[in-house]
Amino acid sequence: MQNFLREREKWKNVRENPQYKPLLDALFEEYDRSCKDKEIPLITFSDEMDFTKTGDRTRFNKKYFLRRKQLSVYAILCMIYPENEEYLEKLQDVICAICNEYSWQISAHRSRIDRNKRDGLSLFSCETGLFLAEIKQMLIDRLDPLVIERITAEIDKRILKSFENSHNLWIETLKSNWAAVCGGSIGMTFMYESSERFYKVNDRINTFMNNYLDGISDDGGTSEGADYWNYGFCFYAMYFDTFSKYVRGNTAGLEKEKVRKMANFYSSIYLNDKNMVSFSDSSGVGEYHLWLMHFLKEKFDIVMPPKDGGWIDFEKFSAAVRAFLYYNPSNTADSIKSGKTYYEKLSWYIERKEKYGFAIKAGHNGEEHNHNDIGSFIVANKRKQILCDLGSAQYTAVNFGKDRYTIFNNSSLGHSVPIVNGSEQGTGKDFYGTLIVSDKISVDMKNAYPEKIEKLTRSVELKENGLAVTDEFSGIFEIKERLITKEKPVISDGKIILDGAALSYDGDWKLVCSDKVIKTHEGNNLTVFILDFMPKTKTEKFTLNIDF
């Protein structure tokens, strides 16, 4: 396979061409954060056991991923500044520390049954094998032979033999981002290490990739949300791009119509230049793998998303190194333009007006990285979401266990949807909604709740200077309309002011404002504000007007 990672002229251009300065700035900023005056973090037994005892993965993950950031930074610096022997020395130290890790799996991904299994295959163990294989290929002429021997032995034991000796692995049945990340990483690692062994497992790798595509809607959308599109599609594209170099031009995996549609998904779900749709376990902040968008621009001529969102993820060497190799300074990104996006199969509708952006979803409550959120909607001004979807909560054992929906972000209580007869929405595919797009946008929500409901329909009228959201219902003895926002509401002249937008509602409804402190995905405290509306008299309709 052509060793594209070692193209000396390309790396010379990165160093000397002033158009690459933003990338070099990002590299040295990460160096200052993760490497300068920092030792390789020691991962202790108590770090390993923290998740088992408390369900908190923060302490272990911080050290684990800092090591991978150091790995990426030093390896890339070695290519740009080959005369600096200190970078190579530091890199080899990090490589050996990673090779010494008891397992390449994070503690949260090791089951309680086989916690002593050192060669388990899950997201980050598969990634680690790939990172080391690519660094070995990239610096084969500079790494100490003992380091090369160690990398080869650990990859063989932890990735290649582990995969060859296991059949019908649980990860081979998944249809989420895991399929692309695990399958792509394993496949590329085999490519780098052994042609003969790769072709023996190629059919299994193709199963991973086909499973990943099966989890994508026919119109190219993913219910996992923007962040997991960015993750899974990154490894899908990376695998087939690497495969095309391996077999000299075979790009079949990238020529499928669904893949072409997928390529445009990310750019299509922006609400403004900084914010995206944050349904499911997403952040709502437009941050994308820089290399991926430049690759997709070259391959599919996609609409480039706002350049400020371009991100080099130094936790993932293979994505980080490609940012430097695939970056094209001539690719420019325009501001997000007004327009509509309708993913019928996914049941998402997004519309961008001059003054605001809007998104609403239906689907079902058994999706990947599911939230119970049928009928949930987002409204953003030109700066931020003012009626928000909170997106992903902090990842803990609870978040992926039987009590997932006790977490505010994940339950319907944490979304802008009604509470009906004192109940939140149900969990599972049996609880669903129907999105209808015509003159108005509407969601039939009556099947999203445990109790039988005659009628519960949310309709939205979008105008240039604002929108109206109307819920109509019958066969309900108690209803509480709920809105979620991160903005502290200001009540003025009977209106609710959220960052300049004016919300008005029917006078025969009573407003109760409260707040709640939740944990963000990063583990920080965040105060969110809950706007609850209760009818003063019997009614079968609630209308909310939002003016900009």
Labelled PLM ranges:
Residues M1-L27, F65, I76-I80:
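Extreme N-terminal leader/anchor segments
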Residues Y31-T44, K90-H109, V147-L169, K200-G220, ...:
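Long, well-ordered core segments of solenoidal/helical folds
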Residues G55-R68, S107-S125, E164-A180, S217-F233, ...:
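Solvent-exposed loop and edge beta-strand segments that line ligand/cofactor-binding
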Residues K69-P82, E86, E127-D144, C182-E196, ...:
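Well-ordered alpha-helical scaffold segments within catalytic/enzyme domains
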Residues R112-D227, M238, L325-K337:
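Active-site lining segments of carbohydrate-active enzymes
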Residues F233-C234, M238-I386:
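Carbohydrate-active enzyme catalytic cores, enriched for enzymes
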Residues D308-W311, V398-F548:
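CBM-like, beta-strand-rich accessory domains located in the C-terminal region of large
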Residues Y356-T434:
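Catalytic core of carbohydrate-active enzymes
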